[in-house]
Amino acid sequence: MAEISTDIAAMSFEEALAELDLIVRRLEEGKGRLDDSIVAYERGALLKKHCEAKLEEARTKVERIVSGPDGSVALQAVDNV
C-alpha cells in the first residue's frame, strides 16, 4: 500500500473521516468508472489508516483523574482503553 500523502497527513481526524465517508457513499452508489473507483478505494484505505493513527495517538494521550486516599487528585495515563 502507498504511503500516506502529504495532504492526508496534514488532515485532522474529522477532515479525514468526512472525506472517507464521502468516498464510501460514492463507492456504494456504484455509478462511477472502475478506474475512478479503484483510485477512490486506495485513497479511502489511506484515509482509514490515517484515522486509525489519529485515534491511537489520542488514546495514548487520554488520562483519567485519580483520587488519592488523602483526597489529593492526580492524573494517571490509561493503559488499556
From Swiss-Prot:
Catalysed reactions, semicolon-separated: Exonucleolytic cleavage in either 5'- to 3'- or 3'- to 5'-direction to yield nucleoside 5'-phosphates
GO biological process: DNA catabolic process
GO molecular function: exodeoxyribonuclease VII activity
A single Gene Ontology CC term: exodeoxyribonuclease VII complex
Domain of life where this protein originates: Bacteria
UniProt cross-references to Gene3D superfamilies, sorted A to Z: Exonuclease VII, small subunit (1.10.287.1040)
Pfam families: Exonuc_VII_S
InterPro entries: Exonuc_VII_S (IPR003761), Exonuc_VII_ssu_sf (IPR037004)
UniProt keyword terms in alphabetical order: Cytoplasm, Exonuclease, Hydrolase, Nuclease
EC number: 3.1.11.6
Location within or outside the cell: Cytoplasm
Record-linked HAMAP family: Exonuc_7_S
Function statement: Bidirectionally degrades single-stranded DNA into large acid-insoluble oligonucleotides, which are then degraded further into small acid-soluble oligonucleotides.
Quaternary structure, from the entry: Heterooligomer composed of large and small subunits.
Family: Belongs to the XseB family.
Protein name stated in the entry: Exodeoxyribonuclease 7 small subunit
Species this protein is from: Paramagnetospirillum magneticum (strain ATCC 700264 / AMB-1)
This protein's encoding gene: xseB
